Structures are given as C-alpha cells and as structure tokens.
UniProtKB/Swiss-Prot annotation:
Protein name, UniProt field: Alpha-N-acetyl-neuraminyl-2,3-beta-galactosyl-1,3-N-acetyl-galactosaminide alpha-2,6-sialyltransferase
Homology family: Belongs to the glycosyltransferase 29 family.
GO biological process: one example: O-glycan processing
Species of provenance: Homo sapiens (Human)
Gene: ST6GALNAC4
Free-text tissue specificity from the UniProt record: Ubiquitous.
Native organism taxonomy: Eukaryota, Metazoa, Chordata, Craniata, Vertebrata
Gene Ontology CC, one term: Golgi membrane
Enzyme class: transferase
Length: 302
C-alpha cells in the first residue's frame, strides 16, 4: 500500500476507535469517562428528564455494593452549613423543594425556621461520621427517610479490608434495617479529583488540597437534580469585600470560628487545607451552564 493510502487508513481507524470509545464510556456510565461524554464535565442546560429511576454507578450501597438507583429530582435545595443561614427565615422555602441536601452533622432541630426540617440526602465526610454518632438516635433512628452519602479515601473507607469508617457504616445498617447508606466509589473519588484538576489546573494532592464536603455535594446534586438552589453559600469574592458581616463558620456553632477567617486561612495554607474560595469560583462557572441559583446571599455568576 502506498504511503498516502496507509496514512488515510490510519486516520480512519483512529477516528473510528475514538468514536467507539466515547460511546462505550457513555453507555457504561463510567465516571472517569464522563468528562469526554458530558460537555467536559456537565452538560449545558437543564438535566434531561428521564421517566423512571436512573442508575448512578459512582455510588455504592452499604453493605451489598449495589449502585444508587433512584428517580431524578426536579428541584433541589442544597443547604450550606454556613452562619449565613441564621435569621434567613427560609425554612419553608427549603422544605418545598423536592429534594433537600444537607452536609455532615448540620442539624435541623432548633433551626427549622432558617434551614427547614426535611433531609432527603445528607452528604457526609468520613471524618464526620463520629460526629453523627454522638446523636445517632436523631440521625439514624428518627430520620429514616434520609439517604446518607459518605465520601472518603484510604484505609478508613476500604471495603475489602474493612476500614474503620466502613465498619461503622456496616454496623449502622445492621442496627437500623432499611437505613440507606452509600459511599462514593473509588472511581468516583478519582473523578472528583480530576474535575478539580481540570477546573483549576492544579493536582489536588500535589497542591496540598483537600476537597470539601460542599464539593462532593455539588457534584452529586448536578447528577441528581434538574434545578438547584444553593442556600447560604457566598461567592468567591465575598470575603474580599470590606463591608461583609462577620458570621460563624457553621450556623450551629455560634461564637466559634468566623466564616471568612476560616476560608482565607485554608486558601492561604500551603498544605492539608480545603480550598473553599477556589471551589466557589468553580461553582460560579458551573452555574453559567446549569440551572444553579445562589440564595441568601444572592449573587450572580460573572
């Protein structure tokens, strides 16, 4: 075969292989391929409405390891744990959403007027599981309709070797039959790291960064929700404004850490820190492509 003909054949084979690879990735729903399939990371516009439950392979149930299967949510309220929620009076509005996302041990009792009382999904860091156990009767006995989504890496979450946190989750499902507990799969955790690197240009580990529970919550919400309202999350420029009020880092820990002081300290720390402000800049960019609204404080994406 002549050189020009061989070159054309090589190009055609490459195109066909690439097309087949992308189609297989999308069909299989592999998290590590999603960046190729879904307009870099997340599709533009609202999430397509698909009748019936969907399978989400990035989340694995405890103890059987089955993927998350559930109906998509038409409207979602993502409730920040920030002190911005104090005095908001948005509880009824939050509870009116079809699905309500909460994070870690953020309580509702005593704060219903501001943060609502419903909890559809609670995204929990593996380090926060012991904090929920301090009030296990409330979180796991009374709130039986809540789905718990736990994220974490390393030996504590190891299913095969029985990591400490995983053993705790396993025990909870035995104590409370019917309790819905899921974990982010290893592939999904790697995918979340890759999104951070693609969005910021920085490798998470090499830059000394820990992703926040808010990061994992937003990614989960983007998969499950058609429309998202985020309550109590400030913009990436908020803490640089001279007129911003001082509020507690968590609405349920009054008189403790200041929100902006915490954000700035983590952003400037060289190692082992959350990059809260960087993450908020990323969320702002996502809101340009997806129906995400930020409320209390209300701010527009730039």
């Amino acid at each position: 075969m002549k050189a020009p003909g061989r070159l054309v054949l090589i190009i055609l084979c490459s195109v066909v292989f690439s097309a087949v690879y992308i189609l297989l990735c999308c069909w299989a729903g592999l998290p590590l391929c999603l960046a190729t399939c879904l307009d870099h990371h997340f599709p533009t516009g609202s999430r397509p409405t698909v009748p019936g439950p969907l399978h989400f392979s990035g989340y694995s149930s405890v103890p059987d390891g089955k993927p998350l299967v559930r109906e998509p949510c038409r409207s979602c309220a993502v409730v920040s744990s920030s002190g911005q929620m104090l005095g908001s009076g948005l509880g009824a509005e939050i509870d009116s959403a079809e699905c309500v996302f909460r994070m870690n041990q953020a309580p509702t009792v005593g704060f219903e007027a501001d943060v609502g009382q419903r909890s559809t999904l609670r995204v929990v860091s593996h380090t926060s599981v012991p904090l929920l156990l301090r009030n296990y009767s409330h979180y796991f006995q009374k709130a039986r309709d809540t789905l718990y989504m736990v994220w974490g890496q390393g030996r504590h979450m190891d299913r095969v070797l029985g990591g400490r946190t995983y053993r705790t989750l396993l025990q909870l499902t035995r104590m409370y039959p019917g309790l819905q507990v899921y974990t982010f799969t290893e592939r999904m955790m790697a995918y979340c790291d890759q999104i951070f690197q693609d969005e910021t240009g920085k490798n998470r580990r090499q830059s000394g960064s820990f992703l926040s529970t808010g990061w994992f919550t937003m990614i989960l919400a983007l998969e499950l929700c058609e429309e998202i309202v985020v309550y109590g999350m400030v913009s990436d420029s908020y803490c640089r404004e001279k007129s911003h009020p001082s509020v507690p880092y968590h609405y349920f820990e009054k008189g403790r850490l200041d929100e902006c002081q915490m954000y700035l300290a983590h952003e400037q720390a060289p190692r082992s820190a959350h990059r809260f402000i960087t993450e908020k800049a990323v969320f702002s960019r996502w809101a340009k492509k997806r129906p995400i609204v930020f409320a209390h404080p209300s701010w527009r994406t730039e």
